């Protein structure tokens, strides 16, 4: 299954300064897509039959009383299709991780997980 087009979608559910490099994350992911010869898409919803995907990057984290950032992040390539009028989500690649990051944030961790996902894309 070849990906021809993709759009980066960021979902920021982090509080307390646990994820602050959204622009850097988007640019890094878009560069990785270009390096894999995947075109930047322009669609409302990616259609599987057209080999369109969202590169969905989500961080859910909060700062603890001790000052750590605790939460999870999910990086995945997803698309959608309809069969007999029902919508289905197709996940091509996915990385779901949780972390407790002492006295810092999810910034570098997010970039590392995006890199891991791209290492799996052939």
Feature roles, as predicted:
Residues 2-8, 28, 35-36, 40-70:
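A short, hydrophobic beta-strand-centered structural micro-motif
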Residues 21, 56-58, 89:
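Intrinsic disorder/low-complexity segments enriched in polar/charged and small flexible residues
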Residues 31, 35, 116-119:
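A generic structural signal for well-ordered alpha-helical segments enriched in polar/charged residues
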Residues 12-14, 61-65, 77-81:
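Beta-strand elements of well-folded, non-transmembrane domains
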Residues 26-31, 76-78, 94:
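Short, low-complexity, polar/charged sequence segments that are solvent-exposed and flexible
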Residues 1-27, 31:
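A structural "domain/chain start" motif
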Residues 1, 82-122:
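C-terminal/domain-edge helix-coil "capping" segments
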Residues 67-87:
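An acidic-aromatic pocket/loop used at catalytic or ligand-binding sites
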């Amino acid at each position: 299954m070849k990906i021809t087009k993709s759009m980066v979608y960021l979902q920021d559910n982090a509080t307390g300064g646990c994820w602050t490099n959204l622009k850097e994350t988007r640019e890094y992911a878009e560069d990785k897509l270009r390096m894999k010869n995947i075109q930047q898409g322009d669609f409302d919803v990616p259609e599987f039959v057209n080999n369109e995907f969202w590169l969905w990057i989500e961080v859910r984290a909060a700062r603890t009383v001790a000052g750590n950032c605790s939460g999870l992040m999910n990086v995945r390539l997803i698309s959608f299709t309809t069969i007999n009028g029902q919508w289905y989500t197709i996940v091509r690649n996915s990385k779901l991780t949780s972390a407790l990051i002492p006295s810092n944030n999810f910034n570098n961790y997010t970039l590392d997980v995006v890199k891991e996902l791209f290492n799996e894309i052939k």
